[in-house]
């Protein structure tokens, strides 16, 4: 994918022009790779940076498995995190919401698919959220 695209007026714009800082994103990935790796269980085969997750059910030890997954959000608790500048716990809570939905189906949480979206990357905040997500995965 090219870093430069043309808008309808044929003006070339870059990711940077639209507020995307690729260098900051790469620095964040470097900071969190060991954190995310610490959450791996038998069956986890994906590495950080890919655009999908891999889970080997044979390695997980289940017989005749059925996958159960959940996507959820933290809702208005996000506003509390912003107001208190406390971002670690929002990561834990995010995983807990999804893990509880999986558990309610009688299943075991095996993996967590994250999506971190922001208007502008604040690496310090992102790092705290992702540390919380990792802790939530360990607790689940």
Residue ranges and their predicted role:
Residues 12-13, 17-18, 22-26, 119:
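Charge-biased, low-complexity intrinsically disordered regions
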Residues 31-140:
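Glycine-rich phosphate/pyrophosphate-binding loop regions near the starts of catalytic domains
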């Amino acid at each position: 994918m090219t870093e430069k695209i043309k808008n309808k007026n044929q003006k070339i714009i870059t990711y940077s022009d639209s507020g995307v800082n690729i260098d900051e994103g790469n620095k964040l990935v470097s900071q969190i790779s060991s954190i995310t790796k610490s959450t791996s269980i038998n069956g986890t085969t994906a590495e950080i940076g890919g655009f999908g997750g891999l889970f080997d059910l044979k390695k997980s030890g289940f017989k005749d498995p059925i996958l159960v997954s959940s996507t959820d959000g933290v809702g208005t608790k996000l506003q509390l995190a912003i107001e208190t500048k406390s971002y670690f716990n929002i990561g834990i809570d995010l995983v807990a919401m999804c893990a509880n939905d999986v558990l309610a189906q009688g299943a075991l949480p095996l993996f967590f698919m994250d999506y971190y979206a922001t208007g502008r990357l604040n690496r310090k905040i992102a790092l705290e959220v992702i540390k919380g997500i990792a802790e939530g995965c360990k607790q689940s």
